[in-house]
Amino acid sequence: MAPFAPLVSGILLLLWLTAPSRACTCVPPHPQTAFCSSEFVIRAKFVGTSEVNQTTLQRRYEIKMTKMFKGFSALGDAPDTWFVYTPAMESLCGYFHRSENRSEEFLIAGQLLDEKLYITTCSFVAPWNSLSSAQRQGFTKTYAAGCGECSVFPCSSIPCKLQSDTDCLWTDQLLTGSDKGFQSRYLACLPREPGLCTWQSLRPRTA
């Protein structure tokens, strides 16, 4: 049975990674949700070619980390160069990196398993330069303030009703048909007072 252990582990990993996505039918999350639900959030460059392990059915990418926003306790004083793992096939929610620019920085949010970094096509992976200045501020320091107490509640069809005073109604998809609307690009769901969370602007205030 020993020779089959890596294959079994690989299949179990694929099921674990893809179960929430319902066979890759992913609803893009608000960036704050991506931050709070991920075990690591980093800024990094994809510097190596992808390699596929046919035994575990995993693809891995070599990355060079330039900034860590979340995951300090797990990653600690980690080296700058890491491998990020994903299912080998896109049909199994595997992430396929299409950019060939090795100097381009990406925001990568994913999960940790056995001290390895894992992402899927449902993970939040985006060019750093494509994020608004407000989103960059959110990932750098502000989104963390809403984790645990506040929740972004997606509204894609009417009627929508908040479940709690600590929820913020996310209507970008409903109003614009896109997950990259105003609330996604410029707002965070943060505590206003004990037991109450509201949308708050991340844009710098001008005098």
From Swiss-Prot:
Q: Where is the NTR domain?
A: 24-147
Q: Which residues bind Zn(2+)?
A: C24
One GO cellular component this record assigns the protein to is: extracellular space
Gene Ontology annotations of biological process type: cellular response to UV-A; negative regulation of catalytic activity; negative regulation of endopeptidase activity; negative regulation of membrane protein ectodomain proteolysis; positive regulation of cell population proliferation; regulation of integrin-mediated signaling pathway; response to cytokine; response to hormone
Q: Where is it localised?
A: Secreted
- Chief localization: secreted
> What residues bear carbohydrate chains?
N53, N101
Q: Where is this region: Involved in metalloproteinase-binding?
A: 24-27, 90-91
Processing and modification events after translation: The activity of TIMP1 is dependent on the presence of disulfide bonds. N-glycosylated.
Q: What UniProt keywords are attached to this protein's entry?
A: Disulfide bond, Glycoprotein, Growth factor, Metal-binding, Metalloenzyme inhibitor, Metalloprotease inhibitor, Phosphoprotein, Protease inhibitor, Secreted, Signal, Zinc
> Domain of life here?
Eukaryota
Entry-linked PROSITE patterns: NTR, TIMP
**Which Pfam families is this protein grouped with?**
TIMP
GO MF term set: cytokine activity; growth factor activity; metal ion binding; metalloendopeptidase inhibitor activity
Phosphoserine-modified residues are S178
Q: Does the keyword Phosphoprotein apply?
A: yes
Record's signal peptide:
1-23
InterPro entries xref list: Netrin_domain (IPR001134), TIMP (IPR001820), TIMP-like_OB-fold (IPR008993), TIMP_C (IPR027465), TIMP_CS (IPR030490)
Cysteines engaged in disulfide bonds, as pairs: C24-C93, C26-C122, C36-C147, C150-C197, C155-C160, C168-C189
Whether Secreted counts among this entry's keywords is yes
Family according to the record: Belongs to the protease inhibitor I35 (TIMP) family.
The subunit structure is:
Interacts with MMP1, MMP3, MMP10 and MMP13, but has only very low affinity for MMP14. Interacts with CD63; identified in a complex with CD63 and ITGB1.
- Role played: Metalloproteinase inhibitor that functions by forming one to one complexes with target metalloproteinases, such as collagenases, and irreversibly inactivates them by binding to their catalytic zinc cofactor. Acts on MMP1, MMP2, MMP3, MMP7, MMP8, MMP9, MMP10, MMP11, MMP12, MMP13 and MMP16. Does not act on MMP14. Also functions as a growth factor that regulates cell differentiation, migration and cell death and activates cellular signaling cascades via CD63 and ITGB1. Plays a role in integrin signaling.
Please give the name of this protein: Metalloproteinase inhibitor 1
Q: Origin organism of this chain?
A: Equus caballus
